[in-house]
């Protein structure tokens, strides 16, 4: 049986801060497992990765530019080419999560799923039924959602609205708010 590969999945809409989150994670020496890492990038945002700032080597970056490339055969070939012991996926916000799960090789196991959302645009996404469905799709399987640029939602009414949105998709997903001066976990009592 092939070696099991842990997958760290980063999901969210375009411009929600996924690349920045992953870049910061890769700059943290505590994230160095000693394994080679396959970084799968499924969408191009405004920010590019800077591998020279990664805290460790052995990172192979691969682009998945079209959903048709998301197959078990292609992903297995990338695993073999990179010799990876773990995978980080920056997933396309317009693709459904189930499409990824259906494409993962049998030995790839989603170890952690993190969602990001932009506090300045989240209300717009939540108000549009098609975009809301895509957003809820990402939150449903995430352990944590980070609302960045949280100054835009830094009041009780906005946080209650976001809390309800997240709870519509998942009762288990933790909620964090990222402000310019740091990250904050704000507890809101469950109804």
Where do the language-model regions lie?
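Short boundary motifs at domain starts and secondary-structure transition points
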Residues: 1-2, 136
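Phosphate/Mg2+-binding loops and adjacent switch elements
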Residues: 86-176
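Nucleotide-state-sensitive switch-loop elements of NTP-binding domains
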Residues: 2-11, 16, 20-127
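Hydrophobic pocket-lining residues within nucleotide cofactor-binding pockets
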Residues: 14, 150, 191
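Residue-level detector of conserved catalytic or cofactor/ligand-binding positions
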Residues: 184-191
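A generic structural motif
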Residues: 63-68, 175-183
């Amino acid at each position: 049986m092939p070696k099991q590969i842990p997958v760290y999945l980063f999901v969210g809409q375009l411009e929600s801060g996924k690349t920045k989150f992953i870049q910061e994670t890769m700059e943290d020496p505590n994230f160095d497992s000693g394994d080679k890492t396959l970084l799968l990038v499924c969408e191009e945002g405004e920010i590019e990765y800077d591998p020279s700032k990664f805290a460790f080597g052995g990172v192979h970056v691969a682009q998945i530019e079209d959903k048709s490339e998301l197959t078990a055969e292609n992903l297995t070939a990338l695993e073999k080419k990179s010799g990876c012991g773990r995978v980080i996926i920056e997933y396309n916000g317009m693709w459904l999560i189930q499409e990824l799960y259906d494409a993962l090789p049998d030995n790839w196991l989603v170890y952690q799923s993190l969602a990001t959302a932009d506090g300045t645009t989240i209300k717009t996404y939540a108000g549009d039924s098609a975009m809301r469905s895509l957003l809820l799709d990402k939150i449903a399987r995430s352990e944590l959602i980070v609302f960045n640029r949280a100054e835009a939602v830094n009041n009780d009414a906005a946080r209650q609205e976001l809390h309800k949105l997240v709870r519509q998709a998942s009762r288990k997903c933790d909620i964090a708010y990222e402000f310019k001066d740091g990250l904050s976990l704000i507890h809101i009592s469950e109804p």
